[in-house]
């Protein structure tokens, strides 16, 4: 297995995401990413499966209980990826071969699993991407183990 770290825009000491490959199978993990940048997009382009941050809904952050400095941090380019930007990034990644994504690192205070899923899937569908056929979208939950995804021969499928 080949593990390739790549830089991500986050306000931590040398933060990285990861791209994994084994033969023709590829997957990536990109969370704690403040914004869409060509560097990390290039690193996960072509990955069949991704764990991708959909941290927050901008409206929930702006009108939520967090202090102003924390809101600025979350919404900043080195903070966390919002649902809409996640959707825009995923659309490009599906065009490069991504078949399955787990929406991850959802904020407990500034997002809802259904909201993240509906925002991302709605944007994909409006752009002509068939969710379920062109790409599988799932939400990684904080409170339990997610469904298993099996990658084989360049295809992804849910485990039986």
Residue ranges and their predicted role:
Residues 1-49, 143-144, 148-160:
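Core dinuclear metal-dependent hydrolase active-site scaffold
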Residues 38-138:
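Cap/insert and terminal regions of metallo-dependent hydrolase folds
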